[in-house]
Amino acid sequence: LKLAVFDICGTLYHDNTTYSFLRWLSKKNIIKYNKSIMNAPYILRALNVIYSSFSRKDVYRILQVKQLSDFSFDDINKWAREFVDELEENRIYSTNILMEEYKKQGYKIVIASATIEPVARAIAQKLGVEYYSSTIGFLNNKCTGEINKDLLFLKKDTLLHLLKKAETTIVVTDNYTDIELVLVSDHSHIIVRNDRDIEKWNRCLKANARKVDFIKKDA
């Protein structure tokens, strides 16, 4: 098995797709625009990033997803497909081309993302690949607004059954929380914005930096 694992947010698409999906729903007047949740001040979002790195809970995203409460499974998934169709112009073309190259080389392609499942499923269907994502709760076909399983810090554990079988593993990501996946890969393509990101990754990777290459997030 030759395995290539792709992140979604900031890797295949410029967007944080959960957040963008909820903003899309608010623009369609499906959910109410809640400024304190959808457009929190930078300082609060920065504190949330720090808190989540220790607690492994993204409070900001938990609050965002609660806005899906009481919508039906079918409606949420239909809206997710419509949203992804409109997201086409926000693809990062260099990584999408890279995915096609690995497909041609016979790699099994999976996307692994902390984005919510309806969005990940719609993207996976569009790309023709398997997916692993965060799951949200449903009871009697209605969304509970809860994140049942958050993949943010669990990608390696979730993919372990594939990693054990893989003769070669490629990882493509921009996400520092994917460091465990990067470390067990044979080679990784890291998506970065600038030289500062490269320096940060090199500090994290240390001797493992030799098995990665960096792709600037410009297209």
Mark where each language-model region is.
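A metal-dependent, Asp-based hydrolase signature
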Residues: 17-18, 26, 30-97
